């Protein structure tokens, strides 16, 4: 599997640039042995809210939106210190949304905005959403358009290779990276 080969190259210092994969799995194969691999059936197409090409450099940070939303604002948060230390680099946030509904996602993004998570953001990247639950006929795009981050005037990229729907890019939090 190419994503596993890329991972091994990254941790051994033999790969510094990653590229999006061609296909991803929308639905996992039944796990019998645990060695089934990916069920690659869907074409990968990264999208932006404004449909423009993006080139952005900054310090990347993020993770599972479900988990970050729980930690945000607690004594384990640390975003104020991180923002202060790396504000000159600018931040590229990435999020993997595993189980949050679209409506919950909108509320969580508002909470993170109010806690200054996006104060020095240069871009925000979302992987493929694990849950597409909605009570109001949202799509990923309309969910992000209706959220507070759409008013930040920064690139918002979604449907990327960062999610519970593999394969996924290998991200090392805190490094300077360029997304293009």
Task: List PLM regions with ranges.
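Internal helical hairpin/lid segments
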Residues: 76-137
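ATP/nucleoside-binding phosphotransfer catalytic cores, i.e., glycine-rich phosphate-binding loops
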Residues: 123-180
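Short gly/pro-enriched beta-turn/loop segments at secondary-structure junctions
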Residues: 54-55, 60-65, 71-74, 86-90, ...
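Conserved anion/nucleotide-ligand pocket segment
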Residues: 1-66
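Fold-independent oxyanion-binding glycine-rich loops
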Residues: 23-26, 63-64, 71, 96-98, ...
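Predominant activation on well-ordered alpha-helical scaffold segments within soluble catalytic domains
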Residues: 8, 65-73, 106-109, 145
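Generic secondary-structure signature for well-ordered alpha-helical cores
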Residues: 8-21, 70-77, 114, 153
């Amino acid at each position: 599997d190419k994503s596993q080969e890329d991972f091994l190259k990254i941790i051994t210092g033999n790969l510094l640039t990653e590229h999006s994969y061609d296909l991803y799995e929308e639905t996992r194969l039944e796990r019998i042995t645990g060695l089934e691999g990916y069920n690659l059936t869907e074409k990968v197409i990264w999208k932006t809210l404004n449909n423009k090409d993006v080139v952005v450099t900054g310090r990347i940070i993020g993770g599972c939106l479900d988990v970050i939303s729980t930690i945000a604002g607690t004594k384990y948060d640390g975003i104020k210190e991180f923002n202060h230390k790396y504000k000159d680099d600018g931040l590229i946030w990435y999020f993997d949304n595993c189980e949050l509904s679209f409506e919950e996602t909108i509320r969580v993004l508002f909470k993170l905005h109010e806690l200054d998570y996006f104060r020095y953001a240069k871009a925000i990247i979302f992987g493929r959403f694990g849950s597409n639950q909605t009570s109001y006929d949202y799509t990923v795009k309309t969910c992000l358009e209706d959220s507070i981050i759409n008013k930040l005037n920064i690139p918002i990229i979604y449907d990327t290779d960062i999610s519970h729907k593999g394969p996924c890019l290998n991200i090392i939090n805190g490094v300077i990276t360029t997304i293009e």
